[in-house]
Amino acid sequence: MRTDILDRKEEIAQWIAQGKSKAEIARMLSCSSNTLEAYLGKLGIVVIPTNRQYDNKYKSATEYLYNGSPISSYKLKNKILNEGLKPHKCESCGLESWLDKPIPLELEHKDGNHYNNEWDNLALLCPNCHALTPTHAGKNIGRYTERTVNTCAICHCEISSRATHCKSCTPKGITINPDITVEQIEYWVSKYSWIRASKELGLSDTGLRKRYKSLTGKDPKSIKKNR
């Protein structure tokens, strides 16, 4: 085993950051390209192929750390790792290896915007931890508004956002009166019955019971009838 190669991880990462090819690095380490490839895997270093015929100027990761920077998450992740800006480990679970190999890492954008490469918005996560984030694969982007609960005007139970009353409080042909009081309910129920009270007050039997319970917190059966 070439322990001398393992001991030169930072130096190798620096050469890669400078844009040196694998062939050049292999010559500098006095090893073959295949040997270099094997040790890069052990060191957890990923090399992005570059076409230096068209661009000889290497840009470091720090040049892309702003909102709207034109670089893919994959390339920026590799630059961050190769330049040693972050250690090769998941920032959530802390794993560095899996099955005796460097654990695969993905670049997480905390706000869900893959173009926002500000440093505080970035995190290196393993695929499992990344999949559990609320913005993974574009989920919930811009949906962090507080949920508004709509309630029935009569019994105050939760209903859909477009409705004004629940089904029990809106029987066909009956006019809703949201101002029904506890005294009215107790009067009609104690003197007659729930059915008579529902007809007099313009609310279904079930709706009237729910209305009474929501206003008093008591069981509707607690109303005693006057004989």
Curated annotation (Swiss-Prot):
The gene is hegA. Its EC number is 3.1.21.-. It comes from Escherichia phage T5. The keyword DNA-binding applies. Keywords: DNA-binding, Early protein, Endonuclease, Hydrolase, Nuclease. It is an enzyme of class 3 (hydrolase). Endonuclease that introduces double-strand break into pseudo palindromic 17 bp DNA sequence yielding 1 bp extensions with 3'-overhangs. This is H-N-H endonuclease F-TflIV. Pfam families: GerE (PF00196). It comes from the Viruses. CDD domains: HNHc (cd00085). Induction: Expressed in the early phase of the viral replicative cycle. One of its GO terms (molecular function) is DNA binding. GO terms for biological process: regulation of DNA-templated transcription.
